[in-house]
Amino acid sequence: MEISASLVKQLRDETGAGFMECKKALEETGGDLEKAKLVLKEKGLARAEKKIGRAASQGLIHAYIHGEGKLGVLVEVNCETDFVARTDDFKELVHEIALQIAGMAPEYVAVEDVPEEVIEQEKEIYRKQAENEGKPAEIIDKIVEGKLQNFYKSKVLLEQPYVRDDSKTIKDLIKEKIALLGENIVVRRFVRWTLGE
């Protein structure tokens, strides 16, 4: 099937992918635009996974103040080059992360940042709750693990559902930007203040 330049251009405009990548995706899917988007997304996220281990020492520190100065967030997000740090896509991502922190009040950046004693304390609470509810011993560990995942979704920034689209997490949002920008992106740290706390 012959793929028209206008179809390739439409796919490029909608995805931000390169011309040849769009053409190959359309050829692979027989000219189906929606399937081609999925192919590009899968390839993009595969590339994003490869970039995750790379050093990220450039980036931005972003300040967000909300509610007439009653709530503030300071977040550091790193990327690999100053060029990417200056792009609108990167700046928008950093702002969205700051809004997420302001709205959802996470306590940790990543699961690895949660202290082991906090995890053990949470597990003990969930285990006792399950026992008090009379749950069978053989399923208590699964219940505890499920509740621990919910704890991560509420307290860990990267695991939280994105406030603008809860079908993806903040980690997914970052992976999409890694695929788009071609560089590793890391949320280094954040602080959230509420007046009077």
From Swiss-Prot:
It is found in: Cytoplasm. Disulfide bonds: none annotated. Transmembrane segments: none annotated. Signal peptide: none annotated. Gene3D superfamilies: 1.10.286.20, DNA helicase RuvA subunit, C-terminal domain, Elongation factor Ts, dimerisation domain. Residues 81-84 are annotated as: Involved in Mg(2+) ion dislocation from EF-Tu. PROSITE patterns: EF_TS_1, EF_TS_2. It comes from the Bacteria. The keyword Protein biosynthesis applies. The keyword Cell membrane does not apply. Its main location: cytoplasm. One of its GO terms (molecular function) is translation elongation factor activity. One of its GO terms (cellular component) is cytoplasm. Keywords: Cytoplasm, Elongation factor, Protein biosynthesis. It holds the Pfam family EF_TS. Belongs to the EF-Ts family. Associates with the EF-Tu.GDP complex and induces the exchange of GDP to GTP. It remains bound to the aminoacyl-tRNA.EF-Tu.GTP complex up to the GTP hydrolysis stage on the ribosome. This is Elongation factor Ts. It comes from Coprothermobacter proteolyticus (strain ATCC 35245 / DSM 5265 / OCM 4 / BT).
